[in-house]
Amino acid sequence: MVALSAAGAWAQEAKSPGCANLDPRACLVLALDAMGGRARLESLKSIAYTSAGHTALVEQSYRQEPFITAYERLMVKVDFAGNRVYRESRLTWPEADPGTSEVVTTFVFGPQGGVRKNASADGPCSLSDLDWARDTLSLGPARLLLTALQAPDLHYESPEVLRATSHAVLAFTTGRKQVRVLLNQFNHLPDAFETVEQFHDHWWQWGDVHRRVYLDNFQDFHGLVYPTNEVEERNGILWQSRQVLSLDQNVAIDETRFRMDPKVAEKSAQGKGWDRPFQADKSQELAPGVTLFEGAWNATLIDQGDGVLVLEAPISGTYIQGVFDEAKRRYSSLPIKAALLTSDSWPHVGGVRQAVARGVPVYILDLNQPLLDRLVKSPHKLHPDLLEQSPKAPRWQIVSEKLSVGTGKNRVELYPLRGASTERQYMVYFPDAKLLYASDTLALNDDGSLYDPELMREVAEAVKREGLLVNTVFAMHQGPMPWTNVMALVQKAGS
């Protein structure tokens, strides 16, 4: 009998480490007590904190891990009573030109939505801004356990080992989001929480992303035991880390800081985010049969007589399907021969899953295949796209050296750049038109100077190396420019 009793106790402990013989709600109460108690957390009507952090720029086209990093200082006020958030951000952007790396923004969120504060007027915020604010109010360290307490479906899931320690796992639903909280079996503090969701930031293209946020460096702030460090992991990548530098509780609320234009806030909430439609109204012919469609991310149709090439598949499946539809409208008798994806930046390849689902061959750089293989295989069950509904294998055409595509006046030649900053991009050359597509290397600042001149310097080296004659150049974020003008800007930047 003693042996059976011990076995039963062991089974209970194995199911919910640190919470043996407790139901999920009682286990949660232990966690609340560890953070200072339910009453202490519920007494928080507002907090203000400053933090320093960094984010790995996993979505950029420079190099894969170890990734280049952006750094950010935040000053945040959270009004729990009014469901409002005020955030001042000072971001250091590593890809900026010298002297222009710091970006300062102010974001305000309330029940009606959110805005970015500008000097003259409020501007729309992004859907990812709204997600961040809602997470701050419901899943931030001061509210995570209280949100779990309100969930009618709170339950145990299988325990997990974190940092060599078994953790009880409590799971619940908030809104449409499934949340799992990992409670330390010894001190009952929440060491991490997890979600699976489709984000509205640069991770949107990956569909169902597994997020784990590690909570660490707990400190006692007048009875509130608060984790001052958060490390966010997405799909196994340590993506972001934030360290709280100061924390004040029940601070006074300055109503003037939370004022916002309600019409702009409503517009923000109605934004499409990355799932935006293609607009064909802004187009220009760069050469007979070569049509550029300019937008935040450009796309180009190339008529080769026996079919149409689509140059770039950016943003989303919705966007690139619009490009395919425009190709069909303009060239109804011609098939889409292939899509040319010249880089691996996530916004630049956001439509690749749609191209694969449509059975379109896709020309990709050799270095980019591992990332694109993962992107094509990534689950999209929460918001199924065409590839999730009808899986297909990609028809990759690998670019590892000069490669000619098509014949006739609009044949193109693909050349890997192989520069230090451009090694994950290839350029597209139109020999007859002496026209060059320079991937994501050419963009102008507001004063007409080159953004990150090193990129175009590496393009110039590749053009010289391959012996190309170029009259006109265009790129992902730049319309056509005379080659001589761009070379003059490169020379000026280096002088």
Residue ranges and their predicted role:
Residues C19-A26, D33, V108-V179, Q185-N187, ...:
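Flexible, processing/modification-adjacent segments and terminal tails
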Residues A20, A26-D33, G37-A121, D153-V161, ...:
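N-terminal mature ectodomain segment of secretory-pathway/periplasmic proteins
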Residues L44-T50, A81-E88, R163-A171, P190-A192, ...:
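Short, hydrophobic/aromatic-rich segments at coil-to-beta transitions
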Residues R163-P262, Y429-P431, A438-S439, L444-E466:
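Gly/Pro-enriched, hydrophobic low-complexity segments
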Residues V231, A460-S495:
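Divalent-metal (often Zn2+) His-rich catalytic cores of metallo-beta-lactamase-fold enzymes
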Residues S241-G305:
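Zn-dependent metallo-beta-lactamase
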Residues Q284-A327, Q425-L444:
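Conserved beta-strand hairpin/beta-sheet module of binuclear metal-dependent hydrolase folds
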Residues T318-Y363, R465-V470:
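Active-site metal-binding motif and surrounding structural segment of the metallo-beta-lactamase
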